């Protein structure tokens, strides 16, 4: 129901009222789900959830008034392509998928798992080249780590929509943020192929098949699906939560940086797996134990995205060494962290006269080759690494935009060592980034390796004037106390 103020005041935004469906014969899950949504909407915030307005007493007149988000549901948008018998453009799939991952990540940062993600619960407020505002709806099956899980206490069974429910939810496990990543994978699969990976099962046995069944590869349905996109989708659909993306931010990162996705056997499949492969997987699934992450926000912090800002000019080997050492320390204390190595070049660099005989691709390759050489000294086992060259005339703003757009958790960059006397009046790039970054920033001072320090001291001693031998002999051999 649309809502307005009784006294005629103009509302700050369109409002809508939601009331629980309580017909004769309906189960108690309707009112329990309504109570969960009423509880969560009052504590959730951000652009990806409807704004809460008011709520009625559950024991008298239960209702919920919230922002009326204008737009189209993802389900209706997908149906428009199905009715026209046209495939959804891959660019739109990737863009909407990244926007959905961003919205889900915002939810996880507030310690909430949606647990009922499906196209009907995703509102696309705007569609265009500049991006979309994705708003998540219907939090009746959601779980907040700081509140009692009313659904888990009330029902001892799988709770969720059969088509999109994650394997761990099938066995009654709630509260793992990677369950939402599985649901995003189902949505991406459906957008790319027009089919659902596991059908729409109605029995417990049908639901449990996703614990071991590998879906038909998207490229078997649609030949123009690139390998990297299939890799992303099938990683989301892994039955073991530990083999999926550790957070929605990591999923969004890959969708926005397709050139950095490491394609494995998953991405190259064009046929489904055979009987014996599924039989072995079924045997493993029989004894599978699911261990959810303790808190969604803690899971995000434990497997962060680390960004290293590497200068591309006016930098010494000592500074690069110090930057590499700081990166090694950060990765050493963060197993599984994703590393993004970033540099910013001037807008006119690729078109300047000094590079007129070089292509932009060649110059990009030169920078990327330098990055990989710099990273040779790092232990990158267990870490996904990507390299990025950003073109901009404002280095600080480019780094900040990258960090915000990719949900970076930690920025490592060199501290300015020249012009120190002027830093009180003019903010340097590191200071600007540290002041406005959406995450922690580590500024690294120059430091030399111990071996080079020893060599430097030896050189200094060699250059020092040596005392005259006769003068030394004339000095007393001992001094009075």
Question: Model-found features: residue ranges?
Answer:
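AlphaC helix of the eukaryotic protein kinase fold
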Residues: 24-43
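Activation-segment/catalytic-loop signature of the eukaryotic protein kinase fold
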Residues: 55
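Conserved short submotifs of the Hanks-type protein kinase catalytic core
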Residues: 59-73, 77
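Protein kinase catalytic-loop region centered on the HRD/HxD motif
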Residues: 100-112
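Activation segment signature within eukaryotic-like protein kinase domains
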Residues: 96-97
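Small/aliphatic-rich secondary-structure junction motif
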Residues: 299-354, 464-481
